[in-house]
Amino acid sequence: INKIFSEAYENVPNWSYVCPKCGWTMTFYGAQAQCCNKSCLKNIPKKDDLKPLRFQDGNWRLRHGVMRYMCLPGQLELKIQKIAEKCGCGAELWPDRDKYDVKITLPDGQVWAIDAKTHRNPYMLKKSIENDYVFTHTKAQKVFYVVPDDCLTDYPDYCKICNDALASSFPDSIAKCVSMRIFSIELKGEVEDVKLRNYQKKS
């Protein structure tokens, strides 16, 4: 257990602050902020406006890689689950032994399969999709790679780059890459359509 703990956690550095975006520890080298996620460094408050952490022996934080590549994607997955449940859908995390991230079941029985991705660079996600397409044999009516909205700030064509890769490498795939905002709109719209169809059947 101690080995696992030491591989996942490290002491909190002196003069650390709570990152207002991801909740990890933000440090400063001069005026330059440092965090595990580059998107956290955009439009940050002044150092004096951040919440300082009082250092004491025994204070721990997740290591950079664990926070960046495990915790942050997990936050996105939980956000997708929350959106689905708010729409009245069932949401199962990590179905089929974590084959993908979220299985959403709509009120009419439709299944949507979601893989949440936090790659800041679309070409990294493109390569990941080409090397490891997770939706092979997945039984679902719709399939999505969902990325945070701020990924499109630096790369407005982010989703197009990934969708072009899907069309080229997996022409029979129904998967598509969308931002969280677009995914939320599509899910809410589909749920409303389901409700309308059910109402029309009863009329």
Identify what each model region corresponds to.
Residues 116-170:
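Catalytic cores of nucleic-acid endonucleases
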Residues 3-4, 160-203:
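Non-catalytic C-terminal interaction segments of nucleic acid-processing enzymes
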Residues 91-100, 120, 124-131, 172-186:
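A short, well-structured beta->alpha microelement
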